[in-house]
Design a protein with these regions (language model features):
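Nucleotide-activated donor-binding/catalytic signature segment of Leloir-type glycosyltransferases, i.e.
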Residues: 9-33
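Short acidic/histidine- and often glycine-rich active-site loop of Leloir-type glycosyltransferases
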Residues: 10, 74-87, 91-92
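A short, well-ordered alpha-helix in the C-terminal region of glycosyltransferases
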Residues: 22, 100, 113-127, 139
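Acidic donor-binding loop of glycosyltransferase active sites
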Residues: 39-54, 70
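Nucleotide-sugar-dependent
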Residues: 49-59, 63, 81-82
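Short hydrophobic beta-strand element within catalytic cores of glycosyltransferases
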Residues: 62, 67-74, 84
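Conserved acidic donor-binding segment of nucleotide-sugar-dependent glycosyltransferases
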Residues: 86-87, 91-98, 107-112
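C-terminal alpha-helical cap of glycosyltransferases
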Residues: 130-141
C-alpha cells in the first residue's frame, strides 16, 4: 500500500515471482480502505532501509497488519523487530538486498507458512492494544 522510490524494483520482483495477479500497489487510501486491503492480504511487506540517516521508527503498520492476522516482512533497519518476531510472526530481512527480500517472500509463502505466522501475529498484536499498554503502565506505578 503506497509508493516509494523502490516501487519499480518491487514490481520487477513481483513479475519474477509471477505474482502480478496477486499483488497491487494502491495509494492515497482512507483508513477504512487500507484496513480492507490488510484484511484480505496474505502478507504485508515493508522492508525499511536507512536513508540519509533517516529510518522508520517503530512501524505501527506491522501491528496494524498483525491485528488482521497478516504476518509481515520488515527491514532490519528501524523498528520492525519491535513488532515482528522473526520466524514466528514474519521475517526481518535486509531491505537493501533485493535477494534477501525475495527470499523472505518465498519463505513465508512456502507451504502456506504465512497462515501459521498470521495466527501468531494476531495473538501477539494484542499486547499493543492501548488497553494493554495502559494496564502495563499502571502496574509500573
Amino acid at each position: 500500500i503506497g509508493q516509494g522510490e523502490n516501487v519499480d524494483n518491487l514490481k520487477k520482483l513481483i513479475t519474477e515471482l509471477k505474482l502480478q495477479d496477486q499483488v497491487i500497489f494502491p495509494k492515497n487510501l482512507t483508513k477504512d480502505e487500507k484496513n480492507s486491503y490488510l484484511k484480505c492480504s496474505d502478507v504485508f511487506v515493508m522492508p525499511s532501509i536507512t536513508y540519509k540517516k533517516s529510518v522508520e521508527g517503530f512501524g505501527i503498520v506491522y501491528v496494524e497488519a498483525a491485528q488482521f492476522g497478516v504476518p509481515s516482512i520488515g527491514g532490519k533497519d528501524g523498528g520492525a523487530a519491535d513488532a515482528i518476531d522473526h520466524d514466528q510472526t514474519g521475517y526481518i530481512c535486509d531491505g537493501n538486498s533485493l535477494d534477501d527480500v525475495y527470499q523472505s517472500i518465498s519463505n513465508i509463502l512456502e507451504n502456506n507458512k504465512y497462515k501459521v505466522f498470521g495466527k501468531k501475529a494476531e495473538e501477539i498484536s494484542k499486547k499493543f492494544y492501548w488497553s494493554e499498554i495502559i494496564k502495563n503502565y499502571l502496574e509500573i506505578f
